[in-house]
Amino acid sequence: MELVVIAKPYANAIFELAQQDKSYLQWKMVLDAGAQLLIDEQMCKFIAFPNVLKQDKLSVIKELLKSILARELSGHEVTFIGILLNNNRINALPSIATLFESLINTTNDAKMFNVISAYQLSELEKKQIVRDLTNQYNKVVNIDAVIDKDLVGGVIIKDGDKVIDMSIKARVNELELRLSKTH
């Protein structure tokens, strides 16, 4: 069975739960972190190993997520991971994360930003931008990163017609304008 088909009821259930207390961001972070764990080949082997009890697998995953998220998992989050393990559906976690994000994007509780940079942003830089924008707007934030080598450095963040220009090119243009006014 295709993972998307398996993932859909789980994503819908988590979305309904997140709607109740507006915990979209917390769930998105847990699902994304869980999906990241499953990229690791050793982690996949550990989860697939039949001699390890599911409770032990849950404990390991819980500790790893706690480390990644820098917080304890909620009871609902632990229960959800446990259900995935017990139903042998933990491998659907990346698809669940993707579907959950799609559900969030269809609500008014998400914001999309275009981020233009002079170079390819690292995952850490993208996460920092998302974290900063999330804190500023108090909404789930998604970014679409684009490269424009003319910027030299820095970033431009666009939200519709609103622009936050933190590029070196903008600073040089501003300095040039100031210098031309003084002469």
From Swiss-Prot:
**UniProt keyword RNA-binding, yes or no:** no
Q: Please report the record's description of how this protein sits within the membrane.
A: Peripheral membrane protein
Q: Where in the cell is it found?
A: Cell inner membrane
Main subcellular localization, coarse class? membrane
Q: What UniProt keywords apply to this chain's record, in alphabetical order? A: ATP synthesis, Cell inner membrane, Cell membrane, CF(1), Hydrogen ion transport, Ion transport, Membrane, Transport
Q: Name one Pfam family in it.
A: OSCP
One annotated GO molecular function is:
proton-transporting ATP synthase activity, rotational mechanism
GO cellular component terms, semicolon-separated? plasma membrane; proton-transporting ATP synthase complex
Q: Which SUPFAM superfamilies does UniProt cross-reference here?
A: N-terminal domain of the delta subunit of the F1F0-ATP synthase
- Coiled coil regions, renumbered to chain: none
| InterPro entries referenced in this protein's UniProt entry, alphabetically | ATP_synth_OSCP/delta_N_sf, ATPase_OSCP/d_CS, ATPase_OSCP/dsu
* Taxonomy, superkingdom: Bacteria
Q: Belongs to which family?
A: Belongs to the ATPase delta chain family.
On assembly, the entry states:
F-type ATPases have 2 components, F(1) - the catalytic core - and F(0) - the membrane proton channel. F(1) has five subunits: alpha(3), beta(3), gamma(1), delta(1), epsilon(1). F(0) has three main subunits: a(1), b(2) and c(10-14). The alpha and beta chains form an alternating ring which encloses part of the gamma chain. F(1) is attached to F(0) by a central stalk formed by the gamma and epsilon chains, while a peripheral stalk is formed by the delta and b chains.
NCBIfam families assigned: ATP_synt_delta, PRK05758.2-2
Explain the purpose of this protein.
F(1)F(0) ATP synthase produces ATP from ADP in the presence of a proton or sodium gradient. F-type ATPases consist of two structural domains, F(1) containing the extramembraneous catalytic core and F(0) containing the membrane proton channel, linked together by a central stalk and a peripheral stalk. During catalysis, ATP synthesis in the catalytic domain of F(1) is coupled via a rotary mechanism of the central stalk subunits to proton translocation.
Q: What is this protein called?
A: ATP synthase subunit delta
The lineage, from the top, is: Bacteria, Pseudomonadati, Pseudomonadota, Gammaproteobacteria, Candidatus Pseudothioglobaceae
